[in-house]
A protein has these predicted regions:
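N-terminal core-binding DNA-recognition domain of tyrosine site-specific recombinases/integrases
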Residues: 1-17, 65-67, 142-146, 165-167
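Conserved tyrosine-mediated DNA breakage-rejoining catalytic core shared by Y-recombinases
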Residues: 79, 84, 88-122
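Basic, Lys/Arg- and aromatic-enriched nucleic-acid-binding interface segment
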Residues: 51-83
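Flexible interdomain linker/hinge and immediately adjacent N-terminus
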Residues: 28-56, 101-105, 138-141
Length: 223
């Protein structure tokens, strides 16, 4: 598999499947050890959404009259919620200024910024949504992850942002990095994101290759 130039993570997934099959056959002694992968030191620049790029996506959505999409981008990026948690952003939650998110038997409270609440309430009134979910389709059903993904991708060309950077989860990554720059508290960020492990949160904070190169340059050790 290495000769086929597969990524180490991909190889480990395949090995795990083979190992499960070997156990099923009653041959556990023939299991293969997975590759040891060093934790990444930096993220791929081609997938890192920057703040200016996010703002261009927002502006493009507004220019095209796609108010719902613009608000969706702001809601995900401004609170750090998962795309699957958008359904918890209800009229009632906006009036309270917080959303109660239930996931895996746990309830997490997400504070909704005042400015965002005012925008959401204005949109809800305009759409005549008196209660329940705010982000609805024309059939008054909750908007799906697939639709959000597709609508975001449709902004890429006009916004001048690479499609590889434009997907809902990247908004959550941008929130995490921006939040950490302000508070410098990874434990607090983990709570906000709903992570049970700080190690998961650390993945969100990995710098890009460009940022890492800048750090090395600032060391001043190359004369």
């Amino acid at each position: 598999m290495l000769e086929a130039k597969l990524a180490p993570a991909t190889i480990n997934v395949k090995l795990a499947a083979v190992n499960r099959f070997l156990v099923f056959l009653g041959w556990p002694a023939f299991r293969v050890k997975p590759l040891r992968i060093q934790r990444r030191l930096f993220r791929d620049d081609s997938r890192e959404l920057t703040r200016p790029e996010y703002l261009r996506l927002l502006e493009t959505a507004r220019t095209q009259g796609r108010e719902r999409l613009a608000l969706l981008l702001e809601t995900i990026c401004g609170t750090g919620i998962r795309v699957s948690e958008v359904r918890y952003v209800t009229v009632e939650a906006v009036y309270r200024g917080r959303a109660e998110i239930s996931l895996k038997g746990k309830i997490r409270t997400i504070l909704l910024p005042g400015k965002l609440c005012r925008k959401l309430l204005k949109y809800a009134r305009k759409q005549k949504i008196a209660s329940g979910e705010i982000f609805l389709t024309r059939n008054e059903k909750g908007i799906s992850r697939r639709q959000i993904w597709a609508e975001m991708k449709a902004l890429c060309d006009k916004a001048g942002v690479a499609p590889s950077k434009v997907f809902p989860h990247n908004l959550r990554h941008l929130f995490a990095k921006t939040f950490y720059r302000v508070c410098r508290d990874v434990a607090r960020l983990a709570d906000v994101l709903g992570h049970s492990s700080i190690e998961t949160t650390r993945i969100y904070l990995i710098s890009t290759g460009t940022e890492h190169a800048g750090t090395l340059a600032r060391l001043g050790l190359i004369c």
